[in-house]
Amino acid sequence: MHEHLKEKLAILPDQPGCYLMKDKQGTVIYVGKAKVLKNRVRSYFTGSHDGKTLRLVGEIVDFEYIVTSSNLEALILELNLIKKHDPKYNIQLKDDKTYPFIKITAEKQPRLLITRNVKKDKGKYFGPYPNAQSAHETKKLLDRMYPLRKCSNMPDKVCLYYHMGQCLAPCVKEVTEEQNKEIVDEIIKFLNGGHKEVRSELETKMYEASEKLEFERAKELRDQIAHIDAIMEKQKMIMSDLVDRDVFGYAVDKGWMCVQVFFVRKGKLIERDVSMFPIYDEPEEGFLTFIGQFYENSSHFKPKEIVVPGSIDSELVERFLEVEATQPKRGKKKDLVELANKNAKIALEEKFYLIERDEERTIKAVENLGKQLGIETPYRIEAFDNSNIQGTNPVSAMIAFIDGKPAKKEYRKYKIKTVQGPDDYESMREVVRRRYTRALKEGLPLPDLIIIDGGKGHLAAASDVLENELGLYIPMAGLVKDDKHKTSHLIIGDPPEPVMLERNSQEFYLLQRIQDEVHRFAITFHRQLHGKSVIQSALDDIPGIGDKRKKILLKHFGSLKKMKEASVTEFVEAGMPKNVAETIYSYLADKKTL
């Protein structure tokens, strides 16, 4: 531990507040809150931790803290700090999980819509529906039962919906405000839980139609009743008070937290939400952070009541969210919390089972690959690929797989330095020489298997450098592609012999992942360099632009396209003098010069 950390830990206050953990660049990597800052912050640097927390602690070189007057203030501050700094180790609940709502528009001739975009308008919103299919089925039923306008724009003649009895055709007929209000009121009654009442009314109308020998009408009403029954069958009544509430449960294991939310609407359990994420805090603190972010999402409306597990400070939740929060001791609500807890525990168990199963499969694939090639199990595999499009910016890339999984910190990029023109074989010789000369010099771990993305020529070039120049005898195989540029087979030995693998085997899938990954890494690097060279060459003829300013512009804008779209002011903001900014702008505006 850094000495200055020990000094700061010794003077931490025993008050509530927030703490910000920083890495060696001074970047905030984690924000947390605590009832007692002294105890919580010190706990990171004492005792035993799981692997994820150890990784976090290993990156901490400094921290700050902010004392607050209460736990509630700490919770609010924490959420704001997470928004501001976006730390990589914090819970990241994104707003992309939006649920659909059913909307009745406030137009003169209202419409019934499905939307995920809730606006502050005069429309009426019902939901959310975590199950999108349920929302669409409900709307489809309402469209059949209540003839509101369907078209977004008023056509000049009636459409098919009018002939189907699903629209009153306000485009060509007068539909009064009273008529629309009557229909809208019926829809609202249905969506607010009045299914039984609506069903009863339809049943009465069906019998009346039968008595009048209006069999087509009776059949239509019977079908509507059947649709209501089908939808209601999926939403069983679990609470008799018809209160809208969200019921929370959670479980923690192996450094992960799973939170399950049951959405109870009008007494019915309509759906659940599952979130799973790494946790570096006490479970109760992690849960409070989660619930704060959960209701910041625009698709999560606060219900009348929030039900939380017994370990959570419900008073704090209530004051923070400004909604009733309860901790049931008995009864149906307690049963629901326990069910949510149980589901969260099962979800974590399934996650770890799948991880362990995948790890077993991956290790087995590595072992089988070694057997197929007649070598020791290649726990560490390094793979090389060249990228050279039209002879410009030749590069190579090396990736590493350890225990069958990508080790991205071990990846390396190489600009080709000694080869003139496009020469794949010489490029391969150069990068293999550079990689393993450095590995020997610095005592870096050597691979159990080297894979060269290429055929016999590439393999021969790499083997020659490895054995004859460096004196290393590491198993090396060439990865051969088919005519569709897909993984075909390996070649190994001297002379190289093909090794065919079963295409549905785990070891073949492993090779595919390695080939795809090294190709992706190499070509991404090539495109980055190519993009930079395009920008630099485009700026060569502009007066006042030397290498230093080229680098500044490249770093600020990133692409020629963005530079061409920029204004004089934006070039000044990038650090260019105004006269130079005007020159750049004029030059790039003249497309003939590019």
UniProtKB/Swiss-Prot annotation:
GO molecular function terms attached to this record: DNA binding; excinuclease ABC activity
Domain UVR, chain residue ranges per copy: 196-231
GO cellular component: cytoplasm; excinuclease repair complex
One Pfam family, short name: GIY-YIG
Database matches in Gene3D superfamilies: 5' to 3' exonuclease, C-terminal subdomain, GIY-YIG endonuclease, UVR domain, UvrC, RNAse H endonuclease domain
Keywords annotated in UniProt: Cytoplasm, DNA damage, DNA excision, DNA repair, Excision nuclease, SOS response
Predominant location category: cytoplasm
SMART domains reported in the protein's UniProt record: GIYc
GO BP of this protein: nucleotide-excision repair; SOS response
Entry's localization field: Cytoplasm
Sequence ranges assigned to domain GIY-YIG in this UniProt record: 14-91
Keyword DNA repair: yes
Domain of life: Bacteria
Family statement: Belongs to the UvrC family.
Listed HAMAP family: UvrC (MF_00203)
PANTHER family, alphabetized: UVRABC SYSTEM PROTEIN C, UVRC/OXIDOREDUCTASE
Function: The UvrABC repair system catalyzes the recognition and processing of DNA lesions. UvrC both incises the 5' and 3' sides of the lesion. The N-terminal half is responsible for the 3' incision and the C-terminal half is responsible for the 5' incision.
Subunit and interaction comment: Interacts with UvrB in an incision complex.
The protein's name in its UniProt record: UvrABC system protein C
Organism: Bacillus cereus (strain AH187)
Name of the gene this protein is made from: uvrC
